[in-house]
Amino acid sequence: MAKYAAAIDQGTTSTRCMIFDHSGNVICYDQKEHEQIYPRPGWVEHSPDEIWERTQSVIRGALSKGGLSASDIVAVGITNQRETTVVWNRKTGRPVYNAIVWQDTRTDQICNELAADGGQDRFRPKVGLPLATYFSGPKIRWILDNVPGAREAAEAGDVVFGNIDTFLTWWLTGGPNGGVHVTDVTNASRTMLMNLETLDWDDEILGIMGIPRQMLPKIVPSSMVYGTATGELAGVPVAGILGDQQAAMVGQTCFDVGEAKNTYGTGSFMLLNTGTKLVPSKSGLLTTVCYKFGDQPAVYALEGSIAITGALVQWLRDNLGLITSSAEVEALANLVEDNGGIYFVPAFSGLFAPYWRSDARGVIVGLTRYVNKDHLARAVLEATAYQTREVLDAMEQDSGVKLTALKVDGGMVYNNTLMQFQADILGVPVIRPKVAETTSLGAAYAAGLAVGFWSNTDEMRANWGVDHTWTPQMDEATRERLYRGWKKAVTRTFDWVE
């Protein structure tokens, strides 16, 4: 009797397969990193073939570590780095180009040309997103314009588009031999091509962007049986798809209007459940789909996306060599009482929410001879907390709801120094759940819900529990003084790229 739900979590830097029991506990998992390809400044790519190879490898690894086989798994769900764009040949499965990653800024010129008529918010009323290099539509357009033969093949129906969820679902369900070509509403809502009200591709925007409709996947709910897996998971229903941040919302059981979570990964992403109501943002946030379970109405969210948070710690490690492991940043930061007067604004890929400035680049301000590497480490951690505060302020403005606490997840939530500073700078408690692997858990929940392994959201909510709460310990005057300094530092990043 199958008694576990599996999740494939394909992230920006690594791929994991996690297997959960009915109580939401991790039974076993396997994880493998993949190569980050930087062909030019501002360009970021992944090899789709390597990602599929890693996916098969971690499925094998997780089953082996748990002493399990496909017959023990009720269903598998997929969660993924969103926006990252793959175009491949449907007959062979071969990509026509590397995956263009969400952080990649090569489509800046395409976005500027599209914004010349109607501005950055030209499509926002329909899609909830500003024109930005972050989203998939302009990336597809770049591939069609720059890869010889790609446009003709797309028009002929020979090459197809998908975000990573679509690419993996297609391969999992057979690839060239009958693979299912679908994407869920959460991933589709990040392409800039899906109408948020109809939950279908928008023909007017497709025409303006020059993207043939026949290359796009079918849009489906986040929880339903899409097909049956082949290979390592042969016979297991593929039954859940959620973009990584939406999956974390489901894993955190943020099913009520007004519930919010922040995930700290390569970047950071805060989402606020707005229910079945679309809330347009006037403060630089995104309106996005939170989830859609089966035939139930879609639930929407406001999202604040921050491009660089955890990646800044990696940069300290890999580019500067100031630390040898990410965990060391906390020890360094704790050697000093404050940031020594410096702020580090990591606009490596421009600034995302709430600014949407692709012309911004990273700055360190306030340097004096007094500053040492410990202060730099502290400023790196603080940058994550300040950026989160900016997003929270925007959310409260847009929604009219005052957040009373923030649920957190992701790798950085084990950094106590950061989490305490986060509570201090927000002025609200920060809560880490018992199962911090909420992204994978959310995908497992979506898949398990589709096959009746979990009967409703109440069953999932019963699994959620508090591991640790950080309460604010900073006085209001200090909080606002520090935050003013940050806001000033941010202005120094603008107008850098011509």
Curated annotation (Swiss-Prot):
It is an enzyme of class 2 (transferase). Sn-glycerol 3-phosphate binds at residues 12, 82-83, 134, 244. ADP binds at residues 12, 16, 266, 310, 411, 415. Its EC number is 2.7.1.30. GO terms for cellular component: cytosol. ATP binds at residues 12-14, 266, 310, 314, 411. One of its GO terms (biological process) is glycerol catabolic process. Pfam families: FGGY_C, FGGY_N. InterPro entries: ATPase_NBD, Carb_kinase_FGGY, Carb_kinase_FGGY_CS, FGGY_C, FGGY_N, Glycerol_kin. Glycerol binds at residues 82-83, 134, 244-245. Keywords: ATP-binding, Glycerol metabolism, Kinase, Nucleotide-binding, Transferase. Signal peptide: none annotated. The keyword Transcription regulation does not apply. Inhibited by fructose 1,6-bisphosphate (FBP). Pathway: Polyol metabolism; glycerol degradation via glycerol kinase pathway; sn-glycerol 3-phosphate from glycerol: step 1/1. One of its GO terms (molecular function) is ATP binding. It catalyses: glycerol + ATP = sn-glycerol 3-phosphate + ADP + H(+). HAMAP family: Glycerol_kin. Key enzyme in the regulation of glycerol uptake and metabolism. Catalyzes the phosphorylation of glycerol to yield sn-glycerol 3-phosphate. Belongs to the FGGY kinase family. This is Glycerol kinase. It comes from Chloroflexus aurantiacus (strain ATCC 29366 / DSM 635 / J-10-fl). The lineage of its organism: Bacteria, Bacillati, Chloroflexota, Chloroflexia, Chloroflexales. The gene is glpK.
